[in-house]
């Protein structure tokens, strides 16, 4: 549905050259909710603006629904752009227009007949839960209601793609949750492919299927949300994950663990998914295999509809441990593990 191939973007300002994107390549599948996360200046907003041609590439290809959009002239892009909706952090509503007129604006600009406009606007306002607000003005609405108007406006042309650039950053936690639930419903009901730009890992955790982590204009890590949360590879990804899930003990606790550790012990970190949590792992290790094991740390969390668990175990190097192949035991059960050095 959306594909970036070796995309580079360079901004030139007087004597200064800034490379905002560096050889970015990945694909977003149809009907996917794909998150792009990174700190300020990572290049994520520049990336999303390439999809609807608010920016153009310096080098590389951006392919949208089979069209290499950078090769099209503006007049030929119009039909493609009709299939792309976008919502922003600050809503971008027309304060002088009613809620109804704001939602209707894309249809008015495309010279849609009044009957069809009314049908589509009423449908979208009902869908986002604002049918009773259609005659009000943006200044009379809360932040969450304004974003619902923006979502209705973006969807009124029934696009295939919805771009969300920091769409929840200006909202409080409860309102953010309701907007994310609405976007998830958009994806399920209309099959819209969503590209979600954010700096909040809680947004990725709640709604996205897959995620790309960006830093300094590059994609440094990518995978399913479950994979990135369970086994982040880069320090940036680890830092983002740690903002919403305690995957390991604090530095103070780790220092305490290490002060009591010697060569007679080995520590392992384990990640268990919702099915593996049901396995009697500790019971088997202790009672069947007679290992001397202590639980130093454990944490459970929700990743979308799945419960996951993080364990930090310490094993004593006694005769039972030396005779037991722990890594084989874990691998046979498809349990992810990491020896803590």
Curated annotation (Swiss-Prot):
One of its GO terms (cellular component) is plasma membrane. Keywords: Amino-acid transport, ATP-binding, Cell membrane, Membrane, Nucleotide-binding, Translocase, Transport. Gene3D superfamilies: 3.30.70.260, P-loop containing nucleotide triphosphate hydrolases. It comes from the Bacteria. It is found in: Cell membrane. Residues 2-241 form the ABC transporter domain. InterPro entries: AAA+_ATPase, ABC_transporter-like_ATP-bd, ABC_transporter-like_CS, ACT-like_dom_sf, MetN_ABC, MetN_ABC_transporter-like, NIL_domain, P-loop_NTPase. Pfam families: ABC_tran (PF00005), NIL (PF09383). The keyword tRNA processing does not apply. It catalyses: L-methionine(out) + ATP + H2O = L-methionine(in) + ADP + phosphate + H(+); D-methionine(out) + ATP + H2O = D-methionine(in) + ADP + phosphate + H(+). ATP binds at residues 38-45. It is a peripheral membrane protein. GO terms for molecular function: ABC-type D-methionine transporter activity; ATP binding; ATP hydrolysis activity. The keyword ATP-binding applies. PROSITE patterns: ABC_TRANSPORTER_1, ABC_TRANSPORTER_2, METN. Part of the ABC transporter complex MetNIQ involved in methionine import. Responsible for energy coupling to the transport system. The complex is composed of two ATP-binding proteins (MetN), two transmembrane proteins (MetI) and a solute-binding protein (MetQ). Belongs to the ABC transporter superfamily. Methionine importer (TC 3.A.1.24) family. This is Methionine import ATP-binding protein MetN 1. It comes from Staphylococcus epidermidis (strain ATCC 35984 / DSM 28319 / BCRC 17069 / CCUG 31568 / BM 3577 / RP62A).
